[in-house]
Amino acid sequence: MPKCPIPIRISFFSYFLKESRILSSNPVNFSIHLRFSSSVSVSPNPSMEVVENPLEAPISEKMFKSAPKMGSFKLGDSTLSSMIESYANSGDFDSVEKLLSRIRLENRVIIERSFIVVFRAYGKAHLPDKAVDLFHRMVDEFRCKRSVKSFNSVLNVIINEGLYHRGLEFYDYVVNSNMNMNISPNGLSFNLVIKALCKLRFVDRAIEVFRGMPERKCLPDGYTYCTLMDGLCKEERIDEAVLLLDEMQSEGCSPSPVIYNVLIDGLCKKGDLTRVTKLVDNMFLKGCVPNEVTYNTLIHGLCLKGKLDKAVSLLERMVSSKCIPNDVTYGTLINGLVKQRRATDAVRLLSSMEERGYHLNQHIYSVLISGLFKEGKAEEAMSLWRKMAEKGCKPNIVVYSVLVDGLCREGKPNEAKEILNRMIASGCLPNAYTYSSLMKGFFKTGLCEEAVQVWKEMDKTGCSRNKFCYSVLIDGLCGVGRVKEAMMVWSKMLTIGIKPDTVAYSSIIKGLCGIGSMDAALKLYHEMLCQEEPKSQPDVVTYNILLDGLCMQKDISRAVDLLNSMLDRGCDPDVITCNTFLNTLSEKSNSCDKGRSFLEELVVRLLKRQRVSGACTIVEVMLGKYLAPKTSTWAMIVREICKPKKINAAIDKCWRNLCT
């Protein structure tokens, strides 16, 4: 018979049973682990089914507080540890602190495992500071020796919270400081440090730590290699990541599907499908079975390269290998097909998805409907919309907005307005994009008053107007000659604190140019130049509007000055810029020589600034107008293009085009 090291009086058990009857009205399942070879469990009602609630501490502190009145019973250290762990797991940190204070006052001893439980609980509650504070108090206040286990627990809490700099500082303080903590990092410690360094893009420093692990008698594991490969891939250092795979295998560490997925993703983003194929072959040779992440990554890579047919074939292979496609798989494929203007093929894929029992979501429907409208297949888009309703898939704000925008593109704003009304009736409130699309649709069909009415209706649904809404209204009003009203809207926008972007500025400048107010338009242009926001700086559209306005007024001198400013600010002319000046110069002279000379001068100026792309655009315009450049101009173009870097870039572009 096992010997009991602590005498327990019968009076305590009598009290305990009495207490349990009192508590039976509010049943709590608890058990007392005595120092026998087996545990003794006592339940308020033996016939009652045990119900465990992980959010409640399983030990009644009230019971233990009352127990000393009945005899010499004293809580053991193991009981206090259990209570701390219970409070921590239930998130009751106030009780944890109270109990820790009691333990400190009574000079009791708590095992390290209990502290680790509290550290993890602090991590789940996003309280890294409390975890660090308790770690520093372990020895002095609780006489608990810290080991690498508690150190790793706190380090993990800090790094999982995204506090990477703080995590590295904590590591350095514990391991390298003169605090004599006598904690030597292990493999997990190094993995956490490497993770933090890679997240901070200090990949070279992470490699140094990785190379120094054997000196600390720690060998890298699969997680170490995977973390480092991921960091290298994010820095576009794919070759180094692939070399690590070879090194890993030579060290006898078998790569997991996660490692292959990281490398495949990096190679796909680089567009190196040849090496991706070799890597997948290597994966199969090593007996590593691709999972849904592998297939999704490969499909995404094929879609990026425009190889949609191969992506669809890979989907079939995925299904045949009994790997179930998910939302990401189908979403990637359908997005790829729609971007390639193959929405009809995407609809066919949709049918095969349904045959496999896949239930389409709002995202898939919105992408398909948008794609069909952009390809001018409005009837098919509306048919899909009706099918969506038949399938019981409730449209969300994205689906409704896509429908409104698509119908407006087709010149059917009244039908789009009906969709908007149905949207509101269903309890789905339109956003700024929905209203802006409808306003643009009405303006496009000449229904200016209806567009203004939509603007007013935004107040009824409580939709706040953004800079895009104001840009649409200003552009629409200017388009029908109502520039004064547009200026009033502009003033209101500035008054309420909305900073106009390039589109808004360009819209009001276009309106002012349309009524011949060039000075006011140029004043706004100079105001744009003073803006700190890059999104408020003039672009080629802004310059073309101003250049056209100046040329319409025959103010060639100021137009040339503005063109010079455009070039100085790094904005290259486009086809519209060239045509604007060619038309103006042709009106002044029937000869084409002035136009050719003007454009050639532009080409030379751009080439001298190494802006080859802009120069080539102008040359294309010249050739389209049968204005062949001089031999000297061609020579400059060839010399600039044939520089080593330019040749390599051209070759890479050529290969990319061949691959697609």
Curated annotation (Swiss-Prot):
Disulfide bridge partners, by residue number: none
Signal peptide: none
Pfam families tied to this protein: PPR, PPR_1, PPR_2
Alphabetic keyword roster: Repeat
GO biological process: embryo development ending in seed dormancy
PPR repeat spans: 76-110, 111-141, 147-181, 186-220, 221-255, 256-290, 291-325, 326-360, 361-395, 396-430, 431-465, 466-500, 501-535, 539-573, 574-609
Family, as annotated: Belongs to the PPR family. P subfamily.
Protein role: May play a role in embryogenesis.
Name of this protein: Pentatricopeptide repeat-containing protein At4g20090
